Amino acid sequence: MTRIQREEPLVVSLLDRLLDDEPGVSTEAAKGRVQVLRELKQSVRRDLEILLNTRTRCLAWPPGLKELKQSLVNYGLPDFTGADLGSAKSREQFCGIVQAVIRQHEPRFKSVRVQLLGGAEPLDRTLRFRIDALLRAEPAPEPVVFDSVLKPATGAFEVKGGADE
């Protein structure tokens, strides 16, 4: 006898459920799977941008406090303000750091890969990279792609994509 698989409903994060996009409306219509998935991707994009624009402390933790390295106290990227991202090797290392930080702090991803994208012009110092990930969703993981930019003048990251445009 075959077992009927019941599809688990997709649910956005608790924070997104508590935020009210339309405070003047007292009731909300039920959302379909496609709309919930789109909202989930948008919230992941927003949270990725926050993660990449957050800096961790510069100093190493005392040797006896190893757990802090894996905790939320260590949320964000190391400060790279003085880093030379001009060489291909340093850019690849930077992408590796970004990938490791996303893996550590974004549990909604099943897998993550960060790859460097070429610049539009030879003198353009903007660092462009793509985040390919599998978003945990039922019944099957959903592939998402985020095109990201590090603006050298401000040190700010901009993350685009993820949702069906």
What are the residue ranges of the model-derived segments?
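Beta-rich nucleic-acid/ligand-interaction surfaces
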Residues: 117-129
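A short beta-strand signature
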Residues: 129-135
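Immediate N-terminus of the mature polypeptide
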Residues: 1-85, 136-165
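A short linear hydrophobic-aromatic micro-motif
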Residues: 112-116
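A cross-taxa feature marking solvent-exposed loop/turn segments within ectodomains of secreted
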Residues: 107, 122, 139-141
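Mid-length scaffold segments of soluble, non-membrane domains
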Residues: 82-105, 109-111
